[in-house]
């Protein structure tokens, strides 16, 4: 059978044809009927940055409470039993519902799922039954796909305007860009709106105090004050943690268990993840930041830990929004002391052209073609008190060059660079001692 648009020419086909004004939406609903089962409670999270972390945190909170929970998105499907890699943040409807049915069959009752703008725009999520939705923030991204920023934002808003049923929970970071429009859309849909953050009404953030690589949060919920030792760095992780807590609380969990669970959560893979440090104690972090806003926030998060210089290695993807490239360059120069511009996933584009667009807006930056070479140079340049951020690829285990995916990991490149730096330092010390 072929599912086709109302105006599609299908007379020559020798198989049954089902016409629909919205064939993508129809496919999603057909997939939902075919694979009817899904976890009882499904919470979707959308926004430019933070989706992966919020989904991971919510899964961990539910697990800590004793629920069978999973998360689905950029880093794959994660359950208590293991991980499954996915090709897309939001899979096509047939694949998605096949996974949902499998999770339900395994006994998973609670699922946190990322709702990407592509997935929302292409109606991949339309057949799902949601208990809650969350909004993190909205900044520039995916303008290679969406014709305008407004079109991109409208795709995100579909979650609250169309997919969540009236009465469902909507958790919104009140301090984020776009929050007012999302709140209005949720109220128009008659959703149960819950806002979090300094300007929030459900969870009010009173203060943040840095304690090493942890943060002490003071929050108020339903008239009670709570102190939380969040084991993560960065103000953006505070926002992500509060959104995930708001989802858990709004879906019935008790505040004592939720806020206790936040003290034990682990960051999502490749999200401001500490990899190791040099012999001089200079730490190196890997982060998925691939938008100007995400890069700024990651650098701002690490700045307090750099008593000396803050270094960053990054590039931009090929065949994607070209307008981001100068913005990324400006962001790096404004917030880091040493900037290394290298390759990300060049895809079909000439890598040098991508780097040139970044370098034009990043005076003083160092251009190095090979990503592993750039990481090695940056690591070798670290001195006591320095911090290095390797941004853009995060959890990814491949680099797309042309149409080929070459095995590559920032984690492995950093580990190799750290080992080489230590060996070089040891060799230098040994040579110095022999000449003493």
Show the residue positions of the predicted features:
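Short, ordered loop/turn segments at secondary-structure junctions
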Residues: 6-8, 74-75, 117-118, 138, ...
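Acidic, Mg2+-coordinating active-site environments of NTP-dependent enzymes
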Residues: 8-14, 121, 130-284, 307, ...
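ATP-dependent carboxylate-amine ligase
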Residues: 25, 63, 190, 243-436
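Short loop/edge segments at beta-strand edges and connector loops
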Residues: 4-6, 19-21, 73, 115, ...
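N-terminal leader/targeting and accessory segments in enzymes
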Residues: 1-29, 33, 169, 177, ...
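Conserved beta-strand scaffold positions in the cores of enzyme catalytic domains, especially
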Residues: 17-19, 42, 69-71, 133, ...
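Phosphate-binding loop of NTP-binding sites
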Residues: 13, 26-174, 178-191, 305-306, ...
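Short, basic phosphate-binding NTP loop
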Residues: 1-46, 53-65, 204, 227, ...
């Amino acid at each position: 059978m072929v599912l086709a648009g109302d105006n599609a020419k299908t007379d020559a086909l020798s198989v049954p044809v089902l016409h629909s004004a919205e064939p993508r939406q129809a496919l999603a609903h057909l997939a939902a009927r075919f694979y009817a089962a899904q976890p009882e409670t499904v919470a979707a999270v959308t926004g430019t940055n933070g989706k992966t972390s919020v989904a991971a945190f919510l899964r961990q909170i539910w697990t800590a409470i004793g629920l069978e929970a999973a998360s689905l998105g950029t880093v794959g499907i994660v359950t208590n039993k293991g991980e499954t890699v996915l090709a897309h943040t939001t899979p096509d409807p047939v694949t998605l519902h096949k996974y949902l049915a499998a999770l339900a069959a395994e006994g998973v009752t609670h699922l946190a799922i990322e709702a990407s703008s592509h997935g929302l725009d292409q109606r991949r999520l339309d057949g799902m039954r949601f208990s809650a939705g969350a909004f993190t923030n909205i900044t520039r991204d995916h303008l290679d796909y969406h014709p305008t920023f407004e079109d991109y934002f409208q795709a995100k808003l579909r979650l609250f305007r169309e997919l969540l049923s009236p009465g469902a929970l909507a958790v919104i970071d009140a301090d984020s860009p776009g929050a007012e429009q999302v709140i209005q859309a949720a109220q128009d849909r008659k959703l149960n709106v819950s806002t979090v953050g300094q300007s929030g009404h459900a969870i009010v953030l009173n203060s943040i105090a840095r304690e090493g690589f942890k943060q002490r949060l003071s929050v108020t919920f339903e008239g009670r004050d709570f102190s939380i030792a969040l084991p993560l760095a960065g103000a953006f992780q505070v926002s992500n943690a509060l959104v995930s807590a708001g989802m858990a609380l709004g879906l019935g969990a008790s505040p004592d268990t939720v806020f206790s669970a936040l003290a034990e959560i682990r960051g999502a893979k490749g999200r401001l993840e500490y990899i190791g440090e040099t012999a001089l104690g200079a730490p190196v972090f890997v982060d998925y930041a691939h938008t100007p806003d995400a890069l700024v926030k990651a650098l701002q998060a690490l700045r307090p830990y750099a008593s000396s210089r803050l270094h960053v290695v990054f590039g931009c993807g090929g065949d994607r929004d070209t307008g981001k490239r100068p913005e990324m360059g400006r962001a790096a120069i404004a917030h880091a002391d040493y900037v290394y511009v290298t390759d990300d996933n060049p895809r079909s584009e000439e890598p040098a052209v991508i780097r040139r667009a970044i370098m034009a807006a990043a005076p003083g930056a160092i251009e190095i073609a090979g990503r592993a070479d750039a990481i090695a140079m940056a690591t070798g340049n670290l001195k006591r008190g320095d911090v290095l951020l390797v941004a853009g690829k995060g959890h990814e285990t491949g680099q797309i060059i042309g149409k080929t995916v070459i095995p590559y990991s920032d984690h492995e490149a950093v580990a190799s660079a750290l080992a080489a730096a230590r060996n070089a330092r040891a060799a230098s010390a040994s040579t110095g001692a022999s000449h003493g």
